[in-house]
Curated annotation (Swiss-Prot):
Stated name of the protein: D-alanine--D-alanine ligase A
Residues that bind Mg(2+) 1: 307, 320
Residue span(s) of domain ATP-grasp: 150-353
One GO MF term attached to the UniProt entry: ATP binding
Binding site for Mg(2+) 2: 320, 322
NCBIfam families: D_ala_D_alaTIGR (TIGR01205), PRK01372.1 (NF002378), PRK01966.1-1 (NF002525), PRK01966.1-4 (NF002528)
Cellular component terms (Gene Ontology): cytosol
Chief site of localization: cytoplasm
GO terms under biological process: cell wall organization; peptidoglycan biosynthetic process; regulation of cell shape
Sorted UniProt keywords: ATP-binding, Cell shape, Cell wall biogenesis/degradation, Cytoplasm, Ligase, Magnesium, Manganese, Metal-binding, Nucleotide-binding, Peptidoglycan synthesis
Annotated organism of origin: Xanthomonas campestris pv. campestris (strain ATCC 33913 / DSM 3586 / NCPPB 528 / LMG 568 / P 25)
Cystine pairs: none
Amino acid sequence: MTGAGMRRIRVGLIFGGKSAEHEVSLQSARNILQALDPQRFEPVLIGIDKQGQWHLSAQESFLLDADDPSRIALRHSGRGLAVLPGAASAQLRAVDAEQALAQIDVVFPIVHGTLGEDGSLQGLLRMANLPFVGSGVLGSAVAMDKDMAKRVLRDAGLEVAPFACFTRHTAAQADVQTLIAQFGLPLFVKPANQGSSVGVSQVRSAEEFSAALELALRYDHKVLVEAAIAGREIECAVLGNATPQASVCGEVVVHDAFYSYQTKYIRDDGAATVIPADIDAHTQHRIQQCALQAYQALDCAGMARVDVFLCADGRIVINEVNTLPGFTRISMYPKLWEASGLDYRSLVTRLIELALERHADDGRLYSSVVTHA
């Protein structure tokens, strides 16, 4: 498609969104845009503002305060976009124009959090018959919901931290003394469907529990109460569809009480990363195998970052599977692949190729009943 006389592949980069991770998404989008191979790809920038409206953005100036993670913002273009599900082509249309946009060949969604990586956006793109980077509806939805993900991982024979789950309607039944007796202190209280440690609290005493529960319920209708796991925080990147590969492992060394949103994206001194992690080859292989098993158990595709705790007794406890990991300047996913021999640009290219391959495979499936004479 990119040879002599052939046009470049048009990549729709979708970013922003209504979630609490809006700013993280903007940082990721900026980096991915810079990493796109200009010889092969033509970017089309689609920003979603905090009200959920889609806008066609200019490549040169789509961000405000791009170098400041605490102030970065989406510059509104004023040109709204609509999606036309079911069309074979021209699925994106400017609402103030007569004609559709030039055909987008593949979408790279980098909308973190609710509505972006929980299967919602993936379902819309699938209905619009657009290839997209990353996991499909099922893998995205299950991995995003920490309660459901833990149940699936546990059933697959992987160890997860002991936990209890409460909804907005059952939160009054969350007895802190019972939870402390069951899990000990500290406890972690977190929204079931958020990422980047948004709304997460470490509870060190019974008196701190109510405020932590209230904070988590501001971000989700379902809340997880989790036992703290004493162990090193190790991360492994996974790449691929049916036959995924695992990267070298990295370690997050947290200087604060836990790996909070501020520590991850705002402060420069809250944590350090060590790549590759200082672990022996056998331990790394075990973690890689657990990461691959978790990836396939959750029906992931394209990419995911698998976070685990490595305990002093050698146990590997799965903490989280992130199907849409960050691509910011400090994000582990691209760093892990770079340490494994795959540079940032090659990684982005491979993710786009995987999206096109999966879409082609899906296109071979029957969409109606086939009868034989």
